[in-house]
Amino acid sequence: MLQVYLVRHGETEWNAARRIQGQSDSPLTANGEHQARLVAQRVSKQGITHVITSDLGRTRRTAQIIAEACGCEVINDPRLRELHMGVLEERLIDSLTPQEEQWRKQMVDGTADGRIPQGESMSELGDRMREALESCLMLPEGSKPLIVSHGIALGCLISTVLGLPAYAERRLRLRNCSLSRVDHQQSPWLASGWIVETAGDVTHLDTPALDELQR
């Protein structure tokens, strides 16, 4: 059985400012660095052999902290990037026009054909995230990889593993530095192939998440 750990990056300056990131980038806050150290401490005893990350700065920094705790190298994989948010990238949520907010809500509410102009669809995101996950099956026997990616991207991936449409990802709450795990197995009791072991675990964190504070 192959176990693959999934970690969302730590809190960023734009998370705190409610600015849309997508494939644009902003650095981790001091709290985001702290979150990364906490999740690194939690997984440091799990025998992680590979830390594979989106090539965006916020994920690479989170991955670096985890890799140092686990004694691994960091492997960059652009397929693990966040959903491209098109014309809404770098925009403050509170500054959106009614039309722009409608585009954003189509994504948040899980609309099958939701796509922000000049952006990426959930189906396209799901396809590249599944490709990245399937690549883990090519690692040497006994490997235990950890993937560092983004909230929408990981939610989309977990949704497809569950057999749900890619756009169902907004039904999953994956907070900054939450820990999830998917396993690939052959089992007489569960579906063969990929299964979800856990999703969105934050028991290692010691402060409320931004979405709790910003309600």
Swiss-Prot record:
Substrate binds at residues 8-15, 21-22, 58, 60, 82-85, 151-152. InterPro entries: His_Pase_superF_clade-1, His_PPase_superfam, PG/BPGM_mutase_AS, PGM_Phosphatase, Phosphoglycerate_mutase_GpmB. Gene3D superfamilies: Phosphoglycerate mutase-like (3.40.50.1240). The active site is at H9 (tele-phosphohistidine intermediate), E82 (proton donor/acceptor). Pathway: Carbohydrate degradation; glycolysis; pyruvate from D-glyceraldehyde 3-phosphate: step 3/5. The record marks H150 as: Transition state stabilizer. Belongs to the phosphoglycerate mutase family. GpmB subfamily. This is Probable phosphoglycerate mutase GpmB. The lineage of its organism: Bacteria, Pseudomonadati, Pseudomonadota, Gammaproteobacteria, Enterobacterales.
